[in-house]
Amino acid sequence: MKKHRYSATNIKQADWKQIGVRTAGERVVLGVDVAKDEFFGVLMGEDLAVSATLKWKHPEQTRALGAHLIEEVHADRLEVAMEPSGTYGDALYRHLSELGIPIYRVSPKRVHDAAEVYDGVPSLHDAKSAYIIARLHRDGGSSLWEAIPEQRRNRKALIAELDLYQDQQQRNLNRLEALLNRHWPEAVRVMELKRVSLLCVLAEYGDPATITAHSEAAWELMRHSGRGLLSAETIEQLLACAQDTLGVPCTAGERHLLRVLAEELLRTHRQIKRIEAQIDQEVHQDALLTRLAAVTGKTTSLVLEAALGSPLDYPNPHSYLKAMGLNLKERSSGKHKGQLKITKRGPGIVRKYQYFTALRWLY
């Protein structure tokens, strides 16, 4: 098996005149290994010969790379193949696409699995990864990288914003629960921690002693914030346990912290409600999402469309299932022989919301 050398030259020092001669009249692919700062690329011809192994600083030298590719690579057709490595390659994708260069994507899993295929060495590093990407593209292991439509990008951003606030909410609920179990343990037994009425009274007064000192105002605040859904008996029970709590009395700083946590939870609650209203509107205006929502729920239907695109774009239901990472794989040998497990490939957020859908069906 042929060994390869993977030493790379910065695009500033590369002999572009010689590269132009080597690539003239050929169909050339630039395989790109994407990183945070230093990108690597391999220019490969139709005969699989490497014209150059390059490296450049991104984004400082990315425009210069594009200029070299357009002006000094004299190929009949130039293509670029790269991994969809999170968001790090998106700016390069945009720049080269605007220059009219077709971009292809190669699965990171394929690159990983091919580590030993071409040189017999089971290692991966930047320049070698770029070579493997170019080679896989030559072998038909890539697909055209199509730009995501603006509407879908907006929906992905909306779901990411919802996930951000839900994560903040859960973290702060955990913090608040820990503090209340120290200072007012009875409260979390009387009411759910994320009830707006409880959060409102905590945001206003902070600790049970201050709530007791302003019991009449606290009663009115809870009745108003509960919007008629909170019974007088529950309010009386909460105020009674505030007066007779076993909790540790708060210092001024601890009382302030309780107020801050409650205020932050109320803020995230409002933001989540705002986003959920936007999701309702998005689903209502889209006939396909409306049909999906009847089965999965509105938020899950939007998650599926944002993460995977329209189910109508898939050739069959199994392909859609595979994109979710919910298709089954079976071990044919070893400790787990015969066991079926889901592959868990694709966006994890899809499986998270599909899990919620399954729970909704069960309960």
Residue ranges of model-derived segments:
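A detector of single, family-specific signature residues
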Residues: 1-363
